[in-house]
A protein has these predicted regions:
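Macromolecular interaction modules
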Residues: 1-224
């Protein structure tokens, strides 16, 4: 939608499936190395993993940052450019990965739900103006009236920062906005996704429902 502003909160959005032959090691790597490694980068606030119950890819990782500036530091460039051998191996095991670095342009409610709905808004939503962002914020406020819906976030990918992963399809990448709906139950996530899709004129194929696996916050590192 609107051009990303570096002072807005950011999210690194990584959605992928994994090679079934190496899925155990893939999850071990994510849980024991990768999430902590990313959350330790200055400016990162949390790393959260989800597993899909409905959608095109099985695993989603969300890494929240104070701002998009966190993706332009020497610490981030070092982590992204100098992957560990374990990371190199598992990045190649990703199947149909999707990496986006996004600004959070509209946010309603608060917190992290046990369930998450993900809606891709499609190419027509790219480059829309501030009024469209305000409209998404208003939609989020409406969805909060559904019992169990606790937060919504509109993510706008930054074209410069959203470089593809090694196994990601380079041709025809669409950096469309993404709408996240956090909920305390699966039924609430589904109801909100259906309501949002109806309001936005999307079809069910653009909805995904995921369950929370675990979350690591930057504050947890100091408590350990």
């Amino acid at each position: 939608m609107t051009t990303s502003i570096t002072t807005l909160p950011g999210i690194l959005f990584v959605w992928t499936s994994a090679d079934p032959e190496h899925e155990l090691d893939f999850n071990r790597w994510y849980d024991r190395e990768h999430v902590e490694e990313r959350v330790r980068i200055p400016g990162f606030v949390s790393g959260t993993r989800y597993q899909s119950v409905r959608g095109p890819r099985k695993y989603l990782g969300l890494y929240r940052t104070v701002s998009l500036a966190a993706f332009q530091t020497a610490d981030y460039f070092k982590a992204f450019g100098q992957q560990t051998p374990w990371s190199v191996a598992n990045l190649q095991r990703m199947v149909d990965p999707m990496r986006r670095v996004c600004a959070i342009e509209a946010e309603t409610g608060m917190g992290t739900g046990a369930w998450l709905a993900v809606l891709r808004l499609g190419a027509p939503a790219i480059g829309q103006d501030a009024a469209a962002v305000a409209g998404m914020a208003a939609l989020g406020a409406t969805l909060l009236q559904i019992d169990g819906v606790i937060a919504t976030r509109l993510l706008t990918p930054d074209a410069k920062l959203s470089g593809p992963l090694p196994a990601e399809q380079k041709d025809g990448r669409v950096l469309d906005p993404i709408f996240l709906i956090d909920a305390s139950s699966e039924s609430a996530a589904v109801a909100a996704a259906n309501a949002a899709s109806a309001a936005l004129g999307l079809d069910g194929e653009q909805e995904a429902i995921l369950q929370l696996s675990w979350q690591l916050r930057e504050a947890d590192l100091h408590a350990a």
